[in-house]
Amino acid sequence: MYYSFMTMKQSDDQIRAQIFKALSDESRLAIIRTLYVSGKELSCGEVGEKCNIVKTTASYHFKTLREAGLTATRKDSRTKYVSLREDTFQTYLPGFLETL
């Protein structure tokens, strides 16, 4: 039982480390802030424009945030939309979004 507790704890720590790594960049924080303030999903292009991030750089940041579980992406025809995964923030960083 102790072993399974430690394994589960380690997994949570790995998730937290990935989240903190994703949030350690000012551009990614700007993306999170933009999505939070908008209160809705936005196209990747809209987020890039609002944050003044070029498309290729924005794509890298969106991938990093998605892999950390902080955002979700959906594709509609040729447009990709990104939204916050507020459940992840509530689980691992309660109150964080309100500080933006």
Curated annotation (Swiss-Prot):
Q: Which Pfam families match?
A: HTH_20
- BP terms from Gene Ontology: regulation of DNA-templated transcription
Q: Please give the InterPro entries that the UniProt record associates with this protein.
A: ArsR-like_HTH, HTH_ArsR_DNA-bd_dom, HTH_MetalResp_TranReg, WH-like_DNA-bd_sf, WH_DNA-bd_sf
Q: Which SUPFAM superfamilies match?
A: Winged helix' DNA-binding domain
Claim: DNA-binding is one of the keywords in the record: yes
CDD domains according to UniProt: HTH_ARSR
Residue ranges forming the DNA-binding region read: 44-67
Task: Name the PROSITE patterns on file.
Answer: HTH_ARSR_2
Taxonomic superkingdom: Bacteria
What Gene Ontology molecular function terms does this protein carry?
DNA binding; DNA-binding transcription factor activity
> Which part of the chain is the HTH arsR-type domain?
8-100
TM region(s), chain numbering: none
The cysteines covalently paired via disulfide bonds are none
Q: Which UniProt keywords apply?
A: DNA-binding, Repressor, Transcription, Transcription regulation
Record's protein name: Uncharacterized HTH-type transcriptional regulator YceK
Its gene is yceK
